[in-house]
C-alpha cells in the first residue's frame, strides 16, 4: 500500500500547484490504522493512511470494509482537517460545490 501512495505523489504535488489543494476526497477499501479498524489481521488498518491524512489533509477519507454490526459503533471520526468515514453499506455525504479555475484560484 505504501508503494501505491508513493506513486501518487507526483499527481498530488501537481494538484497542489495547479489547484491549490492536494485532493478533496480520498476513497479506499481499508481504513487507517486505529481509526475504525479491528485487531484481527484481515481488518487491521494501514499506518501509511495515517501518514497520508496528516500530510495531505483531504477533506474526506472514505473507507469501507469494516462492517458495522452495532449502530452505536463510531462511523465518522475527525482527524485534524480530515473527516474519516466508514461508508460500509452506505453513507451520504453532503459536499459543497467548489469552483476552481485553471490558475488555481478558488
Please annotate each region the language model reported.
Residues 2, 16, 38, 44, ...:
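Context-gated lysine
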Residues 21-57:
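Active-site-proximal segments of metal-dependent phosphoesterases and phosphodiesterases across multiple
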Residues 29, 64-65:
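Active-site glycine-centered loops adjacent to acidic/histidine catalytic or metal-binding residues
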Residues 1-22, 42-50, 106:
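Binuclear metal-dependent hydrolase catalytic cores centered on His/Asp/Glu-rich metal-binding motifs
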Residues 7, 32, 68-70:
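Intrinsic structural disorder/low-complexity segments
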Residues 50-56, 60, 68-106:
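Binuclear metal-dependent phosphoesterase catalytic core
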